[in-house]
């Protein structure tokens, strides 16, 4: 009878990465790093049958989402996921991918990327050991709360993923991390890029002086205030904020238009100011805040955002840079 002390039980399966088309380049970089790191790292269990597949040339599991001429699609797996800890990587705001529908070219929207992810999960048919979704930009994160007769799309998406068998969701700088309340019994990890912001800022602008007399962190609206406070606490500087005055009698493109940005805080005259937010969409609000800070005699203005969507293009930013805004 074998000695039970030689039996090893591990609570994890072998690693598998499925980068969808929207996140293919990043997935390949992660795969290359993991393969190199595991090959160089010492592990006493490498030759143990329990850890079979620990060291491989690649951890990517091949998948695809081919489309019919009608625009409908299906998820397919070319590799087995049985007993595997699968990490699915998806970038729902990658607008560079196109497909044909009824002979016409159509750009993939966040809804298309999200649907493809669900198709791949469905193709696993419950055979994976665990499923983790890595979604840098949280799908529908801006629709995190209800105003009157509106759908709660982000909460619905999270509950839908959990219902499909997803064990953990990893995202970066969620628009409102409290949306995880929709799935209180499942994993939701929100990773903040504060360290990367500070490191890049100091490397690119070495003459910054980090004190309250020379620097100030600005929140462009009420929603970004928590980020601004957290960032300012790390730098040891003061915080200011703008709030948006809206015209609630009018709706333009699905939202109440902004009438003006009003400032709350100490004087910014002669100071370097940092505007921080989770995303730049069209960029109009960010640039309006920057112009107002310049009008208040701020020395230099830096805009930091986790996600640069630039839905209206980059021309307005190039123009603002040229004008010294």
Give the positions of each predicted feature.
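PRPP-associated nucleotide enzymes
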Residues: 1-325
């Amino acid at each position: 009878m074998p000695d039970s002390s030689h039996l090893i039980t591990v609570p994890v399966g072998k690693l598998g990465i499925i980068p969808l088309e929207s996140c293919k380049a990043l997935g390949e970089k992660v795969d290359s790093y993991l393969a190199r790191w595991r090959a160089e790292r010492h592990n006493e269990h490498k030759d143990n049958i329990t850890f079979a597949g620990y060291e491989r040339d690649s951890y990517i599991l091949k998948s695809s989402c081919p489309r019919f001429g009608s625009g409908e699609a299906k998820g397919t797996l070319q590799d087995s996921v049985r007993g595997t800890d699968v990490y699915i990587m998806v970038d729902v705001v990658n607008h560079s991918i196109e497909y044909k529908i009824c002979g016409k070219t159509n750009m993939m929207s966040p809804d298309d990327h999200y649907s493809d992810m669900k198709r791949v999960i469905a193709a696993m048919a419950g055979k994976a050991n665990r499923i983790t979704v890595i979604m840098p930009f949280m799908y529908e994160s801006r629709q995190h709360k209800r105003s009157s007769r509106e759908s709660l799309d982000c909460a619905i998406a999270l509950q839908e993923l959990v219902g499909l068998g997803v064990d953990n969701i990893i995202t970066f700088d969620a628009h409102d991390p409290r949306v995880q309340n929709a799935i209180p019994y499942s994993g939701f990890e929100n990773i903040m890029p504060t360290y990367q912001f500070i490191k890049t800022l100091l490397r690119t602008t070495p003459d910054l002086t980090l004190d309250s007399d020379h620097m100030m962190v600005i929140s462009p609206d009420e929603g970004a205030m928590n980020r601004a406070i957290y960032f300012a606490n790390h730098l040891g500087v003061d915080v200011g904020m703008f709030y948006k005055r809206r015209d609630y009698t009018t709706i333009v493109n699905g939202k109440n238009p902004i009438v003006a940005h009003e400032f709350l805080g100490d004087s910014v005259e002669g100071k370097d100011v940092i505007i921080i937010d989770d995303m730049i969409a069209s960029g109009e609000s960010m640039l309006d805040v920057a112009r107002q800070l310049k009008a208040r005699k701020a020395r230099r203005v830096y805009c930091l955002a986790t996600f640069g969507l630039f839905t209206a293009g980059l021309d307005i930013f190039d123009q603002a840079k040229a004008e010294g805004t």
